[in-house]
Regions:
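Solvent-exposed serine/threonine-rich low-complexity stretches and specific carbohydrate-binding patches
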Residues: 10, 63-72
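Noncatalytic modules at the cell exterior or secretory-pathway interfaces
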Residues: 33-39, 82-99
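Conserved Ser/Thr-centered positions that define the repeating blades of beta-propeller domains
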Residues: 53-55
């Protein structure tokens, strides 16, 4: 985790692409300095469920909100205000064969 994303940086440096998931897995974690988060899920396919997670130590993870189920291809944004965490990541909890989700995150 070479960079810290958050409110102290210029706006364009507050955005990170966490990765593309094609199976039940988690993206790489990034360190953040902020309390307001926007996660963008760019879905290809129609059976993708993602949970966006936070952590205080990078080892123990918890959900920022409920799982987000996507039933068609497209782009969806999810907003999490007032979440105090040090690290964030996303995890696919259901994903069909040949489907994918690319996840980006912005924080402030």
């Amino acid at each position: 985790m070479p960079e810290i994303y958050g409110s102290w940086a210029s706006r364009r440096e507050n955005i990170a692409t966490l990765g593309t998931l094609t199976s039940l897995a988690a993206t790489d974690a990034v360190e953040v300095s902020g309390i307001n988060f926007t996660f963008v899920h760019e879905v290809t396919g129609g059976n993708v469920t993602v949970v966006d997670e936070g952590s205080l130590d990078g080892d123990n993870w918890f959900s920022l909100d409920e799982e987000k189920a996507h039933t068609q291809s497209g782009v969806d944004a999810h907003f999490y205000p007032n979440r105090v965490v040090r690290f964030v990541r996303s995890r696919a909890t259901a994903i069909g064969s040949g489907e994918s989700v690319t996840i980006s995150m912005a924080c402030d």
